[in-house]
């Protein structure tokens, strides 16, 4: 592993995020259409060569404008450089997500790419486990739950999509880890949080923007509750 400091998502510019999303799509298209595994571009700025953690999410865009998940895989540890992590997570999401069949060429015009850049997970330490929800900000934090061999994570965007509160977010991450929903109350269970910034295509191969997940949560979930 590199001795360089891992990239924190707050260091990225919007142009950095745009580059990563375009790179994720290019990696998948080159592999699918030409059987080529792309290499990281040369002469990249230093930030892309430092260790980084990314998740690539691929969604299918339907005629009614709604999207459904098509693949999502990534890295929670700074094993690769930021650029390598983006390429590898994109390929894994497209071809090796066990929940879905491998992506097909005819789908390329109807899929949307989203790259989430993560900070290193940090354990949340509290004296009273009931204080854990107060340590989480929906739209900013993703969660990791770990106990022995059991481990699961949910990205910051997930509670927005379902309008979960903090306790539900904790419980659903417990379930993702293969544990009981109230596992977060167990002192032997380790709870970690990390920050994430998500960059996304508006349309397939279209404009790329950064999601304001805190605003999305406030606006979308308030509307749903009403």
From Swiss-Prot:
Residues 15-210 form the AMMECR1 domain. InterPro entries: AMMECR1, AMMECR1_dom_sf, AMMECR1_domain, AMMECR1_N, AmmeMemoSam_A, Uncharacterised_MJ0810. SUPFAM superfamilies: AMMECR1-like. Disulfide bonds: none annotated. It holds the Pfam family AMMECR1. HAMAP family: AMMECR1 (MF_00645). This is Protein Smar_1309. It comes from Staphylothermus marinus (strain ATCC 43588 / DSM 3639 / JCM 9404 / F1). The lineage of its organism: Archaea, Thermoproteota, Thermoprotei, Desulfurococcales, Desulfurococcaceae.
